[in-house]
Structures are given as structure tokens and as C-alpha cells.
Amino acid sequence: MAKGQSLQDPFLNALRRERIPVSIYLVNGIKLQGQIESFDQFVILLKNTVNQMVYKHAISTVVPARPVSHHSGDRPQGDRPQEKSED
């Protein structure tokens, strides 16, 4: 798995598994809504009244309708646990 997808794949997979409705904003400003049916390295299959194949290079933002509980085995680089403050 490529380093850049270590966060992307578990996030999209959690959205797919839990059937969480999403809003997908494209780089041209168009908003698409539906549920993620499937995805691969290059596309997301979005299901609503019809299925749409959306190319990832055209996506700006993926916004879940509710919080997502995605758990990947390792923590992304640069993401450290919060330190407790000692007052």
C-alpha cells in the first residue's frame, strides 16, 4: 500500500462498510451525494438513485454525514498522541 493511502483507504472503507452518507465536492465546485459503494486506487463508485464513477483526481473533499470510526493499524506519520499537561 502506498504511503499516501494509509489514511485514505481505511477512511473510505469505513464509510463504505458503515454505509455512511457522504457529500463529495469536486474541484470544479459540484457537490455529489450518496453512499460509497466501492473504491480503488483511482475511482470511487458513489450510489444514490444512480451509480456514479467519480475519479479521485476530480475530488476536492469528502464530507461524511456523521462521524466515522475508522481504525488503521498504524498511526499516520505526524499524528502523535496528545500529551497530558502538567498544571
Curated annotation (Swiss-Prot):
Residue span of region Disordered: 65-87
GO cellular-component terms in the record?
Answer: cytosol
Q: Which UniProt keywords apply?
A: RNA-binding, Stress response
Give the stretches traversing the membrane: none
Composition bias (Basic and acidic residues) maps to 71-87
Task: Please cite one Gene Ontology biological process associated with this protein.
Answer: regulation of translation, ncRNA-mediated
Would the keyword RNA-binding turn up in this protein's UniProt record?
yes
Q: Does the keyword Membrane apply?
A: no
**Could you describe the subunit structure of this protein?**
Homohexamer.
Task: Give the family this protein belongs to, as stated in its UniProt record.
Answer: Belongs to the Hfq family.
Name of this protein: RNA-binding protein Hfq
Q: What organism, scientifically named, is this protein from?
A: Vibrio campbellii (strain ATCC BAA-1116)
